[in-house]
Curated annotation (Swiss-Prot):
Belongs to the ATPase epsilon chain family. The gene is atpE. It comes from Pinus koraiensis. It is a peripheral membrane protein. Disulfide bonds: none annotated. CDD domains: F1-ATPase_delta. InterPro entries: ATP_synth_F1_dsu/esu, ATP_synth_F1_dsu/esu_N, ATP_synth_F1_esu_C, ATPsynth_dsu/esu_N. GO terms for cellular component: chloroplast thylakoid membrane; proton-transporting ATP synthase complex. This is ATP synthase epsilon chain, chloroplastic.
């Protein structure tokens, strides 16, 4: 049995095909979805989504949004997302370094929050391609 997974951003369709299983980051933790899952709507946190297709796992960096699950259909609406195969390691590492520097230099609550979110997004890109953020010092 399979699931129909669609991942949509405001600009494009990022994924639209059958999968065997997914694991997504929600605001309350990781959630696995298999065929015949109970119907629900949930917020999707910034994090890595794992996708099992033909017995192999791939990943996608999700930048927050919402997921609607209805038995064998999953629609995920995201602010942005990148498939692991589309992420440039050097660009992701540079983004991570810049985000860390911005967090260190942030002044005031708003700047700290914005810098922290930027760092979380940058870390998610690296995690999606299995690169350790600590390798990006």
């Amino acid at each position: 049995m399979t699931l129909n997974l669609r991942v949509l951003s405001p600009n494009r369709v990022i994924w639209d095909s059958e999968v065997q299983e997914i694991i997504i980051s929600t605001n309350s933790g990781q959630m696995g979805v298999l065929p015949n899952h109970v119907s629900l709507v949930t917020a999707v946190d910034i994090g890595v989504m794992k996708i099992r297709l033909n017995g192999k796992w791939s990943t996608m960096a999700l930048m927050g949004g919402f997921a609607k699950i209805d038995k064998d259909r999953i629609t995920i609406l995201v602010n942005n997302a990148e498939r692991d195969v589309d992420i440039d390691l050097q660009k992701a590492q540079e983004t991570f370094r810049r985000a860390k520097a911005c967090l260190v230099q942030a002044e005031g609550k708003r700047q700290v929050i914005e810098a922290d979110v930027a760092l979380k997004r940058a870390r998610t890109l690296l995690e999606a391609i299995n690169a350790s953020p600590s390798d990006s010092n």
